[in-house]
């Protein structure tokens, strides 16, 4: 018979189990109060998601729990002395992925993930009351509301899976189900409600059923899960889950935040003096404030993984995804050449572009390959082509375009904070590129430094957990004990002058100049044709 570890049998210690449920892999760590990772396991998914139709992205929620158990089992095999002495556990998950459950809290279908591109058209916006339509038009948010609603899966489920919709009792953010599997409590952290839900981030609660945002998302109010404030306890590990996972029975599951919020905290960004830039498939820029401020008009800031703080975030949906797009379409020869040299194609391309002057000889790219909330009709654009440009200029222009878009995001945030960050902290896979890091420093004209760990999200979640347990009094104390600062990269101010001119005279004028063209051409785009 398998031995069941019990929380009360374990001596108090300063270890936390941190579970990072990602899109491509699941990582489990044991982290101590100094920020040191004592044991680590990563489970790379054989199939991150499946698509029953082109553009769909779904996954069975049980899949993630199976991967979690594999990871914690490996931790137990590697270093049982740590897992058996944890003081608690925290979980963080990717955002904006939904699940519907029946009366018995069982999934009715796979979860629809944030990568999913299905759209449900309703040109008349019939989900809104007549006065709401007038209101949204008056405040200039009609297109943004329509964009949000079309990508809210409730409408698709009602239209194409009515039988499942009629059986639905609970409509929940995906982390809710994970919490239920671990503790038996169908609850979700207020830090895990980013997405297409009627959530009031300022007050940390669901909007009432009478609020216009409830009409936009069309989720029955009675179907939404109970909420737990960040830092509070969601529940304790059940005996059933302990048997499968080797996590001690009674271990407290602490409510934290989403992946990006935890990553920002793990970067050490806790006030408006620092900005966190995450360079991944999607790129984000975050600034943390103790007061609720919307980063862009009518778009919310998110709850930080500790109390009384908010993340003002602007996202570039197609961030370093652009590099993969470039290589898939134009990089065949470069991939071959890099293989001959025994280096990655990214290293090879960085060598090719490092001597191209700042501004790519006047080639400017706007990375709207994926639509944004504020500009739902925008598309990607490249201007300035001439005979001097090569494919390497285009590659560098992608880097610069991402940096321009992030700077534009920071400009929007600074309109609310009225403060320019003293430093920018870089994390994510793209931060490994020296060329990209220097471009960002030069575009912003602000010193930058890299996060000390590739697992900044796990570190941030652990810090939030230690604050909850009382190991640290507040976020400032946690950062001082657990986050290290790396070498500072200073901007080249001559390059900054070049980028400043391009940014103000070209980049910022591209969308206003092309907005009418985008509207006229939308019937020719594959993803909007027939609207």
Predicted feature descriptions by range:
Residues 5-44, 87-125, 239, 287-299, ...:
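Glycine/Thr-rich phosphate-binding loops that ligate phosphate moieties of nucleotide
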């Amino acid at each position: 018979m398998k031995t069941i570890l019990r929380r009360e049998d374990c001596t108090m210690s300063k270890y936390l189990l941190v579970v990072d449920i990602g899109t491509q892999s699941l990582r489990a760590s044991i982290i101590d109060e100094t920020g040191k990772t004592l044991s680590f396991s990563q489970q790379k998914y054989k199939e991150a998601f499946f698509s029953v139709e082109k553009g769909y992205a779904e996954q069975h929620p049980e899949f993630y729990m199976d991967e979690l158990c594999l990871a914690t089992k490996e931790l137990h095999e590697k270093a049982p002395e740590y897992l058996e002495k944890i003081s608690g556990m925290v979980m963080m998950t990717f955002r904006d992925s939904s699940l519907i459950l029946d009366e018995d809290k069982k999934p009715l279908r796979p979860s629809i993930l944030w990568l999913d591109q299905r759209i449900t058209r309703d040109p008349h916006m019939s989900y809104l009351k007549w006065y709401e339509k007038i209101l949204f038009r008056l405040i200039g948010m009609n297109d943004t509301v329509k964009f949000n609603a079309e990508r809210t899966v409730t409408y698709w489920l009602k239209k194409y899976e009515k039988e499942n919709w009629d059986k639905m009792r609970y409509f929940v953010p995906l982390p809710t189900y994970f919490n239920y599997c671990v503790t038996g409590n169908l609850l979700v952290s207020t830090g895990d409600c980013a997405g297409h839900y009627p959530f009031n981030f300022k007050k940390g609660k669901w909007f009432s059923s009478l609020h216009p945002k409830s009409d936009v998302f069309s989720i029955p109010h009675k179907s939404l899960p109970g909420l737990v404030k960040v830092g509070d306890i969601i529940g304790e590990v059940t005996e059933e889950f302990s048997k499968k996972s080797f996590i001690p029975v009674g271990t407290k599951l602490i409510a934290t935040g989403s992946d990006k919020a935890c990553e920002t905290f793990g970067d050490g960004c806790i006030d408006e003096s620092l900005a966190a830039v995450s360079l991944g498939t999607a790129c984000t820029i975050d600034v943390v404030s103790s007061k609720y401020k919307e980063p862009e008009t009518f778009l919310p800031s998110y709850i930080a993984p500790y109390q009384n703080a908010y993340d003002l975030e602007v996202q570039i949906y197609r961030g370093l995804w652009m590099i993969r797009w470039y290589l898939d379409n134009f990089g065949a020869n470069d991939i071959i050449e890099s293989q001959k040299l025994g280096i990655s194609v990214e290293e090879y391309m960085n060598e090719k572009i490092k001597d191209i002057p700042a501004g790519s000889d006047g080639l400017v790219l706007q990375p709207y390959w994926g639509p944004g909330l504020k500009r739902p009709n925008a598309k990607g654009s490249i201007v300035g082509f001439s005979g001097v440009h090569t494919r390497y200029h285009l590659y560098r222009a992608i880097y610069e375009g991402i940096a321009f878009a992030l700077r534009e995001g920071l400009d929007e945030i600074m309109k609310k904070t009225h403060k320019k960050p003293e430093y920018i902290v870089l994390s994510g896979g793209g931060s490994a590129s020296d060329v990209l890091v220097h471009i960002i420093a030069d575009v912003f004209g602000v010193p930058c430094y890299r996060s000390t760990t590739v697992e900044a999200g796990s570190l941030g979640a652990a810090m939030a957990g230690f604050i909850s347990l009382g190991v640290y009094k507040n976020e400032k104390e946690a950062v001082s004990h657990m986050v290290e600062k790396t070498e500072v990269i200073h901007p080249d101010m001559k390059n900054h002058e070049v980028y400043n001119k391009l940014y103000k005279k070209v980049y910022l004028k591209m969308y206003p100049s092309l907005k009418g063209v985008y509207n006229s051409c939308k019937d020719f785009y594959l993803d909007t044709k027939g609207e």
